[in-house]
Regions:
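N-terminal Sec/SRP start-transfer signal
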Residues: 1-29
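Membrane-interface junction motifs in transport/secretion proteins
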Residues: 26-49
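Basic-flanked hydrophobic alpha-helices used for secretion and membrane insertion
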Residues: 33, 49, 53-61, 69-76, ...
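Extended, charged/glycine-rich binding lobes that contact polyanionic ligands
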Residues: 64
Length: 216
């Protein structure tokens, strides 16, 4: 009987600690800032949209994102890709490598470490992970050539500001540079997505559902 009485308090103590850890974990996630790039699905990014977004609990920012479809080339490799124009001061990212490239007229890209994995040579052979890593390690001197798919003969260079650990699958650059490129090459410049930043996991889930629900 003594053993039972000794085990019971220990068991209850373990349960209490477990529940406390769960509650603390939940609390910490409700204090965390969440961010995700979300398609507008038919919504129009305008003053009315922003006013409604401001009412969402925990909202930190709603940043416009403008995608530009391009063809990228690097050495003997090339691929179709999207460059996402966004206000870089609002973008949360983790950089693996950073160069000292200065923002100017030449587009300066933040490249996710997996965003160029679809690069292929003229025979259709996908670039190896080893070769891609070698190229990305020299991001300071890396130059990509880009063109809009409707005007393949009109190419322009892009420099690299950083290789990102997160977000790993996107190529981002300044929305001001995106606008300048669109105007220079006669491309559409429209907000198709947003960068949604919300405090708290529950608030973020609800805000994401509200914004990403299909609209007609």
């Amino acid at each position: 009987m003594k053993k039972v009485w000794l085990i019971l308090p220990a068991f209850l103590g373990a349960i209490t600690l477990f529940l406390l850890a769960v509650l603390l974990g939940k609390f910490s996630r409700e204090e965390k800032i969440f961010q995700e790039q979300i398609p507008l699905n038919g919504l129009t990014y305008d003053e009315a949209f922003l006013k409604e977004a401001e009412k969402l609990p925990g909202i930190q920012s709603v940043t416009p994102v403008v995608p530009l479809a391009v063809h990228l080339s690097m050495e003997e490799y090339s691929m179709d890709a999207e460059l996402f124009g966004v206000e870089l001061t609002d973008l949360q990212y983790q950089a693996e490598q950073v160069s000292d490239t200065v923002l100017g007229r030449t587009p300066v890209l933040l490249i996710g470490k997996e965003a160029l994995s679809a690069l292929s040579d003229s025979n259709g052979h996908r670039i190896s992970e080893k070769r891609l890593n070698q190229l990305l390690e020299g991001c300071q001197d890396l130059v990509l050539t880009a063109s809009f798919q409707e005007r393949p003969e009109q190419t322009f260079p892009c420099r690299v500001a950083a290789i990102l650990k997160e977000p790993a699958d996107r190529i981002c650059f300044s929305i001001d540079q995106a606008k300048a490129l669109a105007e220079q090459y006669g491309q559409s410049f429209s907000v198709k997505e947003i960068l949604l930043t919300v405090k708290g996991e529950t608030n973020f889930r609800k805000a994401k559902e509200s914004v990403s629900a299909p609209h007609v």
